[in-house]
């Protein structure tokens, strides 16, 4: 979703102390969901993606205090004067602000499109999210979402999130790529197009073996341009290339897994157990162009 009042100067937090914030969210949600109401192919809406204030609450509070006069600054000054300027209290203020924001968005979604789900915010690694933050999410989300660039979602990580949240879970982003088409390595890379298919099946089928798991969002449909997107990222991460030619090994793997997911999720079948050879995260290896 867009235009919900999340402010770059607040590290993607919303100033819920502004008297117009409810109106902004209400109008934005109403306008955005109008095009999707009644669409049976849509399951729900993501509210946001990887907010940068997560685990930076103390820093964000200092930025607010050092910043220009605005409603959230006055509210923070009042809160700290009453409760004490401590690290826990700064975090508590940010989480209470976040709670108010999520509550307002949730109310608007139920008002304007009650037939679709609130898929929450696509966080990063759930293990980096405190239990207090997860409890806030639990109150407002229908589904807990996170991006997960790993060989597969860690079972212990999923168990922890499931125990705290008791919600279904979706991976918002993951992918595998290689460099044989002249593009850069992806956030998780393998040695060939064939291994991309192996990696896909291993990731998705093992994810679906968890009882709380209901979906994986592959990033992305099409390769990125060789000249790069706005930040220069130019990965071989697509199901198709930039001229819409499918990567057959990957597409066949998607089809194969899709036929097995219900049986895997119900425990009737075991997930694919062949790991891709030499799969590695982007940050762990040198650029393969230099090898």
Where do the model's predicted regions map?
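Glycoside hydrolase catalytic-domain groove-lining segments
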Residues: 92-107, 111-186, 201, 205
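Short, solvent-exposed loop/turn and secondary-structure capping segments
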Residues: 55-60, 181-182, 228-229
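Soluble or luminal CAZymes and related metallo-dependent hydrolases
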Residues: 13, 17-28, 86-101, 153, ...
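Substrate-binding cleft of secreted/luminal carbohydrate-active enzymes
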Residues: 42-44, 49, 174, 188-240, ...
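Active-site clefts of carbohydrate-active enzymes
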Residues: 2-15, 80-89, 124-125, 130-131, ...
